Regions:
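Flexible phosphate-sensing "switch/lid" loops adjacent to ATP/NTP-binding sites
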Residues: 1-372
Length: 372
């Protein structure tokens, strides 16, 4: 069995973290009762959180350590961060690529010695970090890591992107062990699996996973929207991890000729002064609850007049999460546009979806290549 592996992807939001979740869960199950240890590392991180003692680490390292109970130290799991302004500092000579690589090398050495298998997760596509002479392929070559690459489900454009990423790996002498397709159209699974596998044969690289798209994994939560819009929940805080199957910008009046249809799992965006819309949402939620159902609605309000305490209490009583965004931050149209373009990462506190992602990956991937 190989002892360490780098998880790459052809781009951002393709599925590195999702795949890593499934891989960690698979290996933890395999190691259970054996005394073997599993380790995780994000050699180069970008989004980061404070973990105490003045230390900040990559969000993914935080998620993996806390969710899976990994025992290694944070400083090794996230040795290098690229915060805002870091690239300029590098070009100004405040830090060198040798210093950065030394930090990664020490962290890898520690984790490798402390574990029976080490999963390293890359950042973005294979070339990310090149401006600091620290891209994923260079890191893999330095640490003598083989790689597995995640690509988006599809054929032509997906394979084109894979080819570019593979070329960078080849230039650095990194072996690509396998390819995993993510977010594949369920209706095209068999066709894509067949043709992609045949296309990969020219490189003698196996397709080791074909993961169908699961919308529940990519839908942002109310907590994600609150962070995106730099606002806070004014109600329904216990439903902060609620996510939605549709979004509605409510502009038309609600009256006898224009009823506000009750749609489950819908996020509504409207003006804070639209009492007719807000009352209709609350009324629909209460009517559904009398029949033992929960519409699981969500609400984003904008406008110069913040929602009253009374309204927040009414929304809270029906557990409807609501965010108020003042117009100096964004109007209804801007909010709708931001939401439609937003892709959220799985949150550490969203245990249900972490487990869902791990199980989904494990079900559709064959990790037996690790035993070679």
């Amino acid at each position: 069995m190989i002892k360490h592996l780098l998880v790459l992807s052809t781009g951002q939001h393709v599925g590195k973290t999702t795949l890593s979740l499934g891989l960690v869960k698979t290996l933890q199950s395999k190691f259970q009762g054996s005394g073997k240890q599993l380790a995780y590392c994000k050699p180069v991180g970008q989004q980061h959180v404070a973990v105490g003692g003045g230390l900040r680490v990559d969000k993914d390292a935080f998620l993996f350590k806390e969710h899976f109970g990994l025992v290694q130290e944070y400083k090794d799991m996230s040795p290098v961060l690229f915060p805002d302004g870091f690239t300029r500092d590098f070009i100004d000579g405040k830090v060198t690529s040798q210093q950065l690589m030394d930090s990664i090398r020490v962290a890898h050495r520690n984790l490798y010695a402390q574990s029976d298998f080490l999963i390293c997760e890359g950042t973005g596509h294979t070339g990310v970090g090149s401006i600091c002479e620290l891209n994923n392929a260079q890191v893999a070559a330095e640490l003598k890591l083989d790689a597995v690459c995640v690509a988006l489900g599809g054929l032509g454009s997906s394979f084109d992107q894979l080819a570019m990423n593979r070329e960078m790996l080849k230039q650095n002498g990194v072996r690509l062990r396998g390819v995993i397709l993510n977010k594949v159209n369920p209706k095209k699974m068999d066709m894509i699996k067949d043709y992609y596998s045949r296309a990969l044969k020219r490189w003698d690289i196996p397709l080791v996973g074909c993961i169908p798209d699961l919308k529940d994994l990519s839908c942002p939560t109310m907590a994600d929207y609150a962070k995106l819009l730099k606002s806070k929940l004014i109600s329904g805080k216990s439903a902060s991890l609620r996510y939605f199957s549709s979004t509605r910008l409510a502009l038309a009046p609600v009256d006898g000729n224009n009823l506000f249809k009750a749609i489950p799992n819908q996020l509504v965006i409207t003006h804070s002064g639209r009492k007719d819309v807000i009352d209709a949402i609350i009324g629909n939620e209460e009517a559904s609850s009398t029949h033992g159902r929960n519409l699981k609605s969500g609400l984003i309000l904008t406008g110069w007049n913040p929602p009253s305490t009374e309204l927040a209490q009414r929304l809270d009583a029906d557990n409807i999460p609501c965010i108020y965004v003042s117009p100096d931050k964004a109007d209804s149209y801007t909010i709708t546009a931001r939401i439609s373009q937003f892709t959220a990462k799985i949150r550490r506190d969203d245990v249900e979806r972490i487990d869902l992602a791990a199980d989904h990956v494990s079900k559709h991937c064959d990790f037996s290549f690790l035993d070679e």
